[in-house]
Regions:
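RNA-binding accessory domains that recognize and position tRNA/RNA substrates
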Residues: 1-180, 194-214, 218-221, 225-236, ...
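Nucleotide-activated chemistry modules centered on ATP-dependent adenylation/adenylyltransferase
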Residues: 2, 26, 131-140, 144-181, ...
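Short beta->alpha connector loops
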Residues: 54, 186-187
Length: 394
């Protein structure tokens, strides 16, 4: 399997080396968790994985789950000679090419061969056309082919591929500081958590139990979405922190109607700040997006931020709901996120879309941040086992 990097390939030597070490460790833990064989050789520009023929597609799909990876391809490793490349392309054409247009996409890593990338495209295309099955009329389309035969020629080996699995990109997991992820079990928060994981930050998942204001399936759906997130980083000791927030939420509801959601979100990030201090996290991540709810207007987000000294990261800030929902479907967290939870009872009769920090401070319970500290200290730790997405199979 040939594994390609993105941002990782442009890092300085020292930083790149540390990140590649993280990527290799993450990849090996994924292979072990999924019971897949593979020898992982992490190189400066590419990672090569040697595996069994029957496991090659599953290993390539696993490689495409590794943060920092742009794409992965089941590949045939051969000698970097014209004859070997022609033979490999001919074999691939005879076995798989069943009609439509094709192209040979060739590239070389160094100028140490007696041919250019253009030469490979030319003689490789001839080999594909000559070996095509009898019922096929080969046709070249370099712009939008039905079939792409990829050839990557490196100094010591050449690699021929027909299939490419797109990866998440980003940075290797664990190369950034951890963040506290506030997970409600809704559509947005697991997607936001995944996005910071994709950029290298481990997460500390925190769920606030709303007591009488939560529904019977509220916690269950939050746990299931976190299990799906854990699938992408199974080498970690995953915990789900359940914060008993029912009494505090009830007191906030009694104290305010208009502005209630703002006061609650300020309490929420204060809880997250306390937990971040305990876990060495450098910030908080939420699934908020500008204007999606009354508490998420630009002005109201600034009022929420004023309740904590930590940065509040919002990866979905400018995303539309349809885009977020599609991302949740790709992660296989959408169905769990849409289980009825019955927590809309907390919503006020009149929404506050343009709040005032002074007014919220005046109306919110004066002990709300003390409650946040106590509730965070009482958080229950629940071990999490990773769960595979519905479309996964070895």
């Amino acid at each position: 399997v040939l594994v390609r990097y993105g941002d990782l390939s442009i890092k300085s030597d020292d930083v790149g080396r540390r990140m590649r070490d993280k990527l290799g460790g993450h990849f090996r833990s994924l292979l072990e968790h999924r019971n897949l064989p593979g020898e992982v050789d992490v190189g400066h520009a590419r990672t090569i994985v040697e595996t069994d023929p029957e496991s090659v597609e599953a290993v390539a799909r696993t490689a495409a789950d590794v943060f920092g990876v742009v794409s992965a391809s089941p590949t045939l490793a051969i000698e970097p000679t014209q004859e070997s490349i022609e033979d490999a392309l001919a074999d691939a054409s005879a076995a798989y090419y069943d009609g439509g247009t094709f192209a040979v996409d060739a590239r070389r890593s160094r100028d140490v061969h007696p041919f250019t990338s253009e030469d490979v495209g030319r003689f490789g295309g001839d080999a594909v056309a000559a070996a095509a099955p009898a019922h096929v009329e080969p046709s070249v389309d370099l712009d939008d082919p039905d079939w792409t035969f990829e050839v990557e020629v490196r100094p010591d080996r050449a690699y021929v591929s027909l299939e490419r699995f797109e990866g998440p990109g980003g940075l290797p997991y664990g190369t950034q500081a951890p963040l506290v992820a506030l997970v409600s079990g809704g559509i947005d928060s697991p997607v936001a958590a995944y996005e910071v994981m994709r950029r290298g930050s481990p997460i500390v998942p925190v769920y606030l139990d709303l007591g009488d204001y939560g529904g019977p399936d509220h916690e269950a759906r939050a746990v299931e979405t976190v299990r799906k997130l854990a699938w992408h980083a199974p080498g970690e000791d995953w915990e789900f922190l359940r914060v008993p927030a029912g009494d505090s939420v009830a007191a906030i509801a009694d104290a305010l109607d208009r502005g209630r959601m703002l006061a609650f979100r300020r309490y929420m990030v204060s809880v997250a700040e306390e937990i971040a201090s305990e876990h060495g996290a450098a910030g908080i991540v939420t699934g908020e997006a500008i204007g999606q709810k009354s508490s998420q207007t630009v002005r109201n987000l600034s009022i929420t931020d004023a309740a904590t000294e930590l940065p509040v990261h919002r990866p979905l800030l400018t995303r539309d709901k349809d885009t977020i929902s599609n991302m949740a479907r790709e992660l296989d967290t959408f169905s769990e996120s849409t289980i009825p939870a019955g927590c809309n009872r907390f919503a006020p009769a009149s929404a506050e879309t343009g709040g005032s920090l002074d007014r919220i401070r005046e109306k919110e319970p004066e002990d709300v941040f003390r409650w946040a500290e106590a509730d965070a200290a009482a958080a229950e730790r629940i071990a999490i086992e990773p769960a595979a997405p519905a479309d996964w199979s070895n």
